Amino acid sequence: LVGSEMCIRDRYKGVDPQLSLDMLMRLQTKAPDDNRISKELADVYYTMGQYGKAKEAYESYLKVGTPTEQDYTRYAMLLYLNKDYAQSSDMAKKGLELAPENHVLKRLAMYDNLELKDYKEGLEAAATFFSNPGNPDYVYLDYVYFARLLEADKQYDEAVAQFDKALAMDKSHTEIYKDISDVYEKERDFPKAIEAYKNYLGGMKGDPDISDLFLYGRLNYYAATDSAYQDKQPLYLAEADTIFAQVAAKVPDNYLGNFWRARVNSLRDPETTQGLAKPYYEAALSILEQKPDATKSVLVECNSYLGYYYFVKEDYNQSKLYWNKILEIDPGNETATKALQGIK
């Protein structure tokens, strides 16, 4: 009876997975020791995208069954999708012992090792996976994972080349430009990092979110602070100031927009003679002082600037107010202590 019902189930497996699933559940009630049902359940759950249940069914089957190449492939993929990268890697290795040329298993070996941060093994797996460049089954994400392995190994030029291959394969994935920007930033090649980030922002279908804007502004700020690009510092500072102003306007209860505008304008006024950063440090401080968990170093920076600003303006009482605030936050702060001694 079970055998004939399994045949009927096979007819509906691809047409109506839910019907197939219902039949298998009834079969399992009738024959709970028939391990074939666990495997079939795993296949149906996999088809339906219910990966957690498919994983459980495969685990039940593999306890007593003899896995095939397809079993290893699907189970390793399920484990990967469930973020169980170590076990997925183990299954991929076992599957490759059975089927050394299995394309999906070779892919998973590379993907899993990246997630496990085993970059040496990952690069070896990538070399195996890409050993047949004419294979038509590569997808853009394969090049992304390879690029990230190379980036982790500090092979930055080759990483960018692989990210470029991913984009060439599928230009719709403009988020890859952000990866490229990150690589250039690590190399401190800020002009290229900024160009790539602009491409990332330009490829968005909607408006960029606050974190994307903030990171773009910060990238311009870092470029402005790098001595290699001092000829372009005014341009980078102007762009950073514009972006951080947008951040401050979009999230007025968050200190970051004003705080980074303060840093930008402090660079524009290195002697603090104009007080360009003053209104932004004040705005950031007014927000931070309402937060019990505010970062100490950020509070110290805001108060330090304002203390020094009033010192330059010879408003010593106001200057002392800010230096004393620092000592309330950080009693051992040497800069504040020396500043107060100097005012006396």
Residue spans of the language-model regions?
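Short, small-residue-biased leader/transition segments that mark boundaries at the very start
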Residues: 1-8
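Register position in tetratricopeptide repeats
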Residues: 13-14, 47-48, 81-82, 115-116, ...
